[in-house]
């Protein structure tokens, strides 16, 4: 193969990888806002598209691509999330701090399990079959829970109504989301 053909082939491969990255971005952009696992969908799309990249790079890519969604939330809800906002009253600032404390408490169970078992979970569950199974299981669970709760009023309407026991239960369900194919918001909803 001549030098110009190699260069053309390399450019074609690079363009193909760019298109794959755009497709990953579209999948992330859509699934991050729904009660489905965006990480699970990225794993499945990666299995279909088979980007010519190392597993370590794809792991990092899947984390970095989610930063866009995180930044969108921060920008969209900055006033609500910021306890230092000069536009807030003292009471609003206090409520914002209380919200952050409750978020941290709810994160404890998943953080502990994630730190202790991350490598094991990665080896077992970061594969297309377990991801697909979890997506199906949670899809069925959502339908069951939705039908069971139809017409019921929510037990909690405000963050201020959450006590430590309920926060730890939320955190326990967040542990389920350590398994790809399990939505963080979906696990909390169930």
Where do the language-model regions lie?
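Multi-pass membrane proteins that catalyze or facilitate reactions on polyprenyl-/lipid-phosphate substrates
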Residues: 2-190
